[in-house]
């Protein structure tokens, strides 16, 4: 049973270390006034999209903000124009939901167990844009999410790969092989004859 604690502890630590970044996706959010609204996340962090929500009837149904959100490439992000319906990520289309505002979450994980899930990589940026459902204006809400990663250093120019090899791999190094001869002194045939001759003489009649 004690072996089960290790993966469970690792899972709990990873969940505890993950941060959640909240984005209120509506036209009144001042952060969308800038063209470069950017969030920096780490792997396993979450981005929570909070959809527009109206608790009273002071706003006409036709004026309630609703959006289709897309996950697009950089060029489409700059143009604020998706290329395919396959890029649809979510829909904010329940502005008067009784349970409160809809929350749409993206986990920026390296691997996903889901077939249609999205996988993210360190050091890459991902782009979200939206198109309004409630009206036909061209105002673009867009978000850039950058997954921060570790900086990897390339090997130094003075590193010599020969120094990292085992000594036995160097042909100029003399090594003792396992099939080498024994270090015990050898007895030549003449010496064996001298030693055995007295025994042979004792056995003759």
UniProtKB/Swiss-Prot annotation:
Tissue-level expression: Brain. Down-regulated in primary glioma tissues compared to the normal tissues. The soluble monomeric form is expressed in the glioblastoma multiforme (GBM) and breast cancer cells (at protein level).
SUPFAM superfamilies assigned: Cupredoxins (SSF49503)
GO cellular component: extracellular region; plasma membrane; side of membrane
GO biological process: one example: positive regulation of amyloid-beta formation
GO molecular function terms listed in the Swiss-Prot or TrEMBL record: ephrin receptor binding; signaling receptor binding
InterPro entries in the record: Cupredoxin, Ephrin, Ephrin-A_Ecto, Ephrin_CS, Ephrin_RBD
Lipid modification (GPI-anchor amidated serine), residues: 182
Protein induction: By TNF and IL1B/interleukin-1 beta.
Origin superkingdom: Eukaryota
Glycosylation sites: 26
Its biological purpose: Cell surface GPI-bound ligand for Eph receptors, a family of receptor tyrosine kinases which are crucial for migration, repulsion and adhesion during neuronal, vascular and epithelial development. Binds promiscuously Eph receptors residing on adjacent cells, leading to contact-dependent bidirectional signaling into neighboring cells. Plays an important role in angiogenesis and tumor neovascularization. The recruitment of VAV2, VAV3 and PI3-kinase p85 subunit by phosphorylated EPHA2 is critical for EFNA1-induced RAC1 GTPase activation and vascular endothelial cell migration and assembly.
Assigned protein family: Belongs to the ephrin family.
Protein name: Ephrin-A1
The species this protein was found in: Homo sapiens
